[in-house]
């Protein structure tokens, strides 16, 4: 499959090229909708298609290989993907919401996560804060997060954490987390 390069137009990524690539992946993504619904997670081929479309790079700085598209452009792509697979469109939102949160991170953290692989996937959750207890030179983080979209495909988990009497945000490597397979969206 030949994909359009996301060429720059006056310093901006060609959003029409991204939308063309969504259309090219339409058959592959739609072929796996049933599997994804049955398994409660996106099919690996769908995740691969989203990466090849460029989803993880939407809000990433251009210096790290990102596209720096606008929220409106992201919404256009998300809408096009939702026409194929609503669950895949949800992941577009989740993966990019975590990147938007990254705008507040220091450069060291951003470099650590994205320098080697701008397609690194982050899962995010805004509920069920973990509990952090300060130790000698670190924090011990514990808890259960009852809802974390994209966690099976992500390398990092972004979540709220309670530090004594204040809320903060924690970024955890997924290989330090255990996924409990108890999600049933219908109840």
What are these regions (language model features)?
Residues 129-131, 179-187:
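Short Gly/Thr-rich strand-loop-strand
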Residues 1-60, 66-76:
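Alpha-helical interface subdomain recognition
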Residues 44-52, 57-154:
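Glycine-rich flavin
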Residues 144-183:
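DPxDG-like acidic metal-binding loop motif
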């Amino acid at each position: 499959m030949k994909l359009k390069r996301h060429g720059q137009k006056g310093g901006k990524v060609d959003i029409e090229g991204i939308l063309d690539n969504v259309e090219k992946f339409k058959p592959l993504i739609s072929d796996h909708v049933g599997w994804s619904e049955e398994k409660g997670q996106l099919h690996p081929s769908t995740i691969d298609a989203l990466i090849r479309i460029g989803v993880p790079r939407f809000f990433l700085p251009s210096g790290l290989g990102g596209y720096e598209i606008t929220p409106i452009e992201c919404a256009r792509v998300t809408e096009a993907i939702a026409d194929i697979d609503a669950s895949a469109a949800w992941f577009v939102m989740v993966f990019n919401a975590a990147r938007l949160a990254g705008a507040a991170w220091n450069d060291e953290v951003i470099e650590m996560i994205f320098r080697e692989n701008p397609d690194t996937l982050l899962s995010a959750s805004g509920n069920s804060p973990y509990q952090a207890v300060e130790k000698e030179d670190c924090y011990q983080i514990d808890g259960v997060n009852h809802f974390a979209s994209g966690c099976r495909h992500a390398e990092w988990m972004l979540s709220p954490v309670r530090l004594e009497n204040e809320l903060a945000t924690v970024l955890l490597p997924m290989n330090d987390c255990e996924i409990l397979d108890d999600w049933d969206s219908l109840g």
